[in-house]
Amino acid sequence: MIKKIKIILLIMLSLILTQSLIAKENFTIEQNDEKLELLYFPKKIVTDSAIISRFLAALDIELVGVPSSTTKIPEKYNGVQRIGRSGMPDLEIVKSLKTDLIVSTLYSKPALKPKYDNLNIPSFYLKVDTYDESMEVIEILGKAFHKEEKANAILKDIKHREEILHEKLKDKEPKKIAIIYGNGESFFMTGKNHFLQGLMDKIDCENIVTSIDNSALLKKSVPFSMEQLIKANPDVILRLPTSQTKNGESFEEIFNANPIWKLTKAYKNKKILDIDPTLFRMSAGVNSIDALEELYRYVYE
């Protein structure tokens, strides 16, 4: 009798373990209306995005393919196969890696999903346009890839650093900021729908474009106007260089050639500064807290 009970218990334990293993093999990831469910846990993961590669590296997720990019790919993936330029992968390479999941950005979905579908490779697209979305993606990836402990540690550190900034801001006067970017041929100012707007909000800064162009509320950028800039008279002007002009002139040389800048508070405060395009040209992703701290230093220190 005891022997039979032991056998039954062993069978039950075996079934429980089997079900547990099966459950672990399943994979689910979702964000807003995007959802992907697989009946297996992916082992050969590729990303075609430099931004996404930094999220995955922070969570210690192994990849078999990453993009070639002017934006730095994490050192963790130094020996990993390059699949072509960000947003323009070499599909033959992707296929040859026996890829079983591609993680990309929502921005790339319209162009790339049909191509991946033709290869019968599942793909998922993350929205990382804003600071808050980037924080959400850390949690989403942590849950999907069973890296909750790492994700929680990252988010805890970010929360702590946010609290330090919040304390520093208590005795600071809010500033009016203009963020200008371009290549010397044309210039723009960041609108309310730009990644940088979320950072400005978090350090109590006003984006001057809201007083210049009502449509800025819906845009990532608005055309630059020197006349409007002088009228708005920002406390701080941050320049985001993207490249040199055709004549080889730098962003700074072009601005120095125009003495009208001297009429602004920013000039008088010695607060016309160039900012790092690596952190600020687009969403900084998992490094968004670094961008927030850096923006604070540019504005207030």
Please provide the spans of the model-predicted regions.
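His/Asp/Glu-enriched short active-site or ligand-binding loop at hydrolase and phosphoryl-transfer sites
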Residues: 67-71, 197-218
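Extracytoplasmic ligand-binding site segments that recognize negatively charged/polar headgroups
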Residues: 128-140, 178-199, 245-248
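Structured C-terminal subdomain patch of bacterial secreted/periplasmic proteins
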Residues: 133-136, 143, 152, 166-167, ...
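A short, structured surface patch at a secondary-structure boundary
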Residues: 47-97, 101-106, 205-208
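Flexible loop/hinge segments that line or gate small-molecule binding clefts
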Residues: 73-76, 108-144, 276
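Bacterial Sec-exported substrate-binding components of ABC uptake systems
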Residues: 2-8, 18-51, 149-180, 241, ...
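Short helix-initiation/N-cap motifs at beta->coil->alpha
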Residues: 31-33, 81-92, 214-226
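Proline-aspartate-enriched helix->loop->beta-strand connector
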Residues: 91-104, 121, 225-239
